[in-house]
């Protein structure tokens, strides 16, 4: 069974800074090629650099006082409306996701809806009480804590989950009153541009969310180093994450990292081998293994090693390799 995916309607292939869709300051661009066919050019995108980062941070800094002063419930309401918009555009978002990074359309559709779910969940945080109250020894005295936004935060996202991970980072940052500069992965920026367009339509004020597209060394590094960026959240490889941590902590910024994993499976002799094979297969080949939770090692009890190995190889041989037009159940294998 095949399904030909048409080119979806999409936002401008541009940076999103101060509520405007902009080319890079330098005017430089790069070609985004399809993962299935390297000769397939999806579009031209801005090859941004430090000047674009500076413009985005300036826009976020200018928008921060008014956004932080807005009641949290109103910030949450914008996220809730954005969730509605994402749901109406889920198919467009899913098609662009598969087009740009190769995930089977079934997985992309689920992830597009996940973006909506994340927005919906964090919209509720705008109504949740925060802070604590502490009784004191002195009569008439009370101590309490309140939560305050940090200011401008920098978010750096990977290409393998281009809807879910940006949503996980953006939604909490916004509902708690921060403004955002986000660097999307150069390999998969289209999905994140949909995220920005949905928030813009939901009424997010200009400058609250800014997106800059480009290489890590030309966009990520100046974002981490910018003096007006108070915190960094990075998802990516261990070597790059270590560099982000060292530089951010040296500059006194808050930093959060989600780095690559190396995940094992243990198969005991009394395991249901048929189920174990399916779980290992799914863990290794969902999204072609391009995720931090993918199965990379298998430890099998010696008594069942030969049987398990034979079954797993048979399962791998039964997989179907397909491109985005053939709707494989798994990326690379199905």
Locate the predicted segments by residue.
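Residue-level signal for inorganic ion chemistry
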Residues: 19, 39, 75, 97, ...
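Glycine-rich loop-to-alpha-helix module at the N-terminal edge of alpha/beta enzyme cores
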Residues: 38-129, 140
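Short, well-ordered beta-strand elements within core beta-sheets of diverse protein domains
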Residues: 42-48, 63-69, 155, 265-268, ...
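ALDH superfamily catalytic-core signature
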Residues: 231, 239-334
């Amino acid at each position: 069974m095949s399904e030909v995916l048409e080119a979806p309607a999409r936002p401008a292939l541009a940076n999103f800074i101060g509520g405007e869709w902009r080319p890079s300051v330098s005017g430089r661009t790069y070609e985004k090629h399809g993962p299935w066919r390297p000769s397939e050019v999806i579009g031209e995108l801005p090859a941004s650099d430090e000047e674009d980062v500076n413009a985005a941070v300036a826009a976020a800094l200018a928008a921060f006082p008014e956004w932080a002063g807005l009641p949290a419930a109103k910030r949450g309401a914008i996220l809730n409306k954005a969730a509605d918009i994402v749901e109406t555009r889920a198919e467009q978002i899913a098609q662009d996701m598969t087009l740009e990074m190769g995930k089977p359309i079934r997985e992309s559709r689920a992830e597009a809806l996940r973006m909506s779910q994340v927005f919906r969940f964090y919209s509720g945080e705008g109504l949740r009480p925060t802070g604590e109250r502490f009784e004191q020894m002195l009569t008439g005295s009370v101590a309490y804590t309140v939560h305050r936004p940090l200011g401008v935060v920098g978010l750096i996202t990977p290409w393998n989950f281009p809807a879910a991970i940006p949503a996980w980072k953006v939604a909490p940052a916004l509902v708690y009153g921060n403004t955002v500069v986000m660097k999307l992965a150069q390999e998969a920026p289209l999905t994140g541009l949909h995220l920005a367009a949905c928030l813009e339509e939901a009424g997010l004020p200009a400058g609250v969310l800014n997106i800059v597209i480009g290489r890590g060394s030309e966009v990520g590094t100046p974002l981490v180093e910018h003096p007006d960026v108070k915190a960094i959240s990075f998802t990516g490889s261990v070597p790059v994450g270590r560099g982000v941590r060292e530089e951010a902590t040296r500059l006194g910024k808050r930093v959060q990292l989600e780095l690559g994993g190396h995940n094992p499976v243990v198969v005991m002799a009394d395991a249901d081998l048929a189920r174990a094979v399916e779980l290992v297969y799914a863990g290794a080949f969902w999204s072609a293994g391009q995720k931090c939770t993918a199965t990379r090692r298998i430890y099998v009890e010696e008594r069942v090693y030969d049987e398990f190995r034979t079954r797993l190889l048979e399962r791998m041989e039964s997989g179907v390799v397909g491109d985005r037009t053939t709707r494989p159940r798994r990326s690379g294998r199905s």
